[in-house]
Amino acid sequence: MSVAAKYYPNEPTEPKVVTSEIPGPESKAKVASLGEVFDSRPAYFVADYAKSSGNYIVDVDGNKFLDVYAQISSIALGYNNPALIEAAKSDKMIRALVDRPALGNFPGADLEDILKQLLKFAPKGQNKIWSGLSGADANELAFKAAFMYYRQLQRGGHGIDFSEEENSSVMENTSPGSPQLAVLSFKKAFHGRLFASGSSTCSKPIHKLDFPAFNWPHGEYPVYKYPLSENEEENKKEDDRCLAIVEDLIKSWPTPVAALIIEPIQSEGGDNHASKYFLQSLRDLTSKYNVVYIIDEVQTGVGATGKFWCHEWADIQPPVDLVTFSKKFQSAGYWFHDDRFIPNKAYRQFNTWCGDPARMIIAGAIGQEIVDNNLVDQCARVGDYLFEKLEKLQAKYPTRLINLRGKNRGTFIAFDLETSAERDQLLKLLKSNGCNVGGCAEKSVRLRPSLTFEEKHADIFVDALEKSIGQL
């Protein structure tokens, strides 16, 4: 029995669209009503989560969509997963929800077990965790950890105390207590919409407009030619070009670069992939210049690329310093392994909640279900199957499926259209044909199904895609 059949015996066998347009009349009415108390303008439709099942999301009009977007890559196991429902019913979960603890000051007796369950799924080389609330929060926390680590090294070691000048100047937001330091990120990156994470984000103006930003550098992320197997020499030159820019920025930026953050696949920025060579070379550069190396696995993590963590494809040595996570884990935070990233004093990395044990319980259950059901291997297998079908479709419609990418990266697949208007129209047609799919960057389509997405779902999606292409 397949995993989807075991989990979801009542999952729809195919999409069903019952309204003449998406969103339908009931969704439109509810979006308008919701808009009186909440900004509902980004809503595609209003979902009925009680009726959604497995790989299908149902809206309030009764439309049943094959979901190849999964809440912007955040649903790992499909809708109404029975194992997660059982985890939600546990006494441990009830305590975490009803009496949410301030974990820093009053950790529960079960917190160690909750964290050790999560640590079973940490990336190779990482054995410690700091928990947060969202992907952006995870990156902000990682930046703080990097800055504190960097400054302690400058002071002379972990045990060196702050100077009187540091203690007084920090209250005026001036140096040396508030040092001028930078995080290097990449053009087209997305690391969140808060202030530090927003300064490192560089994908769309709408993410950043009107907000003050730190003067931080953005390197060039390599842009490869596809298929990769036919452009190895040229793509290697592109890697080297971008690496030279990164090294120059580290050496010449007016403020010291304390950390570098990168997505192994830029997701919001267009599903741009970084090669093993590029990611390892960044490790070499960060080690050479004593820059903290942060991998942002918020969207790429938890199995979707055919590894539990995407950067494991690169086998980076020595291991990166910090790895941030959220989305499919339904929790957030960063992994690390070096005790020097624990601040030299308490209350430096701190807030009331210090994470959310309820979400950590769910994250642990998600990880266990993934491992017990070999869902990472399944995702790799289904991704290969889906990619092969898309290659055939690309050969048939070469001007409609451009730069197909994500081969051997599970279901983390994307392709381009010629224009943003054409891409937007294709996404609209896909919904009309029963598939909920998302876009990224200016003209890309990204596939982000759950880990319970199987070959039968891939067949339905490819058929709907071909039908939609024919309607463009």
From Swiss-Prot:
One of its GO terms (cellular component) is mitochondrion. Pyridoxal 5'-phosphate binds at residues 135-136, 352. GO terms for biological process: arginine catabolic process; gamma-aminobutyric acid catabolic process. Coiled coil: none annotated. It catalyses: 4-aminobutanoate + 2-oxoglutarate = succinate semialdehyde + L-glutamate. It is an enzyme of class 2 (transferase). Its main location: cytoplasm. Substrate binds at residue 193. It holds the Pfam family Aminotran_3. The modification N6-(pyridoxal phosphate)lysine is found at residue 327. Its cofactor is pyridoxal 5'-phosphate. Keywords: Aminotransferase, Cytoplasm, Pyridoxal phosphate, Transferase. Pathway: Amino-acid degradation; L-arginine degradation. One of its GO terms (molecular function) is 4-aminobutyrate:2-oxoglutarate transaminase activity. It is found in: Cytoplasm. PROSITE patterns: AA_TRANSFER_CLASS_3. InterPro entries: 4NH2But_aminotransferase_euk, Aminotrans_3, Aminotrans_3_PPA_site, PyrdxlP-dep_Trfase, PyrdxlP-dep_Trfase_major, PyrdxlP-dep_Trfase_small. Its EC number is 2.6.1.19. The keyword ATP-binding does not apply. Belongs to the class-III pyridoxal-phosphate-dependent aminotransferase family. Required for the degradation of gamma-aminobutyric acid (GABA), which is important for utilization of GABA as nitrogen source and for oxidative stress tolerance. Deaminates GABA to succinate semialdehyde, which in turn is converted to succinate by the succinate-semialdehyde dehydrogenase UGA2. May be involved in an alternative, arginase-independent arginine degradation pathway via GABA. Homodimer and homotetramer. Induced 4.7-fold in an arginase-negative strain during exponential growth. This is 4-aminobutyrate aminotransferase.
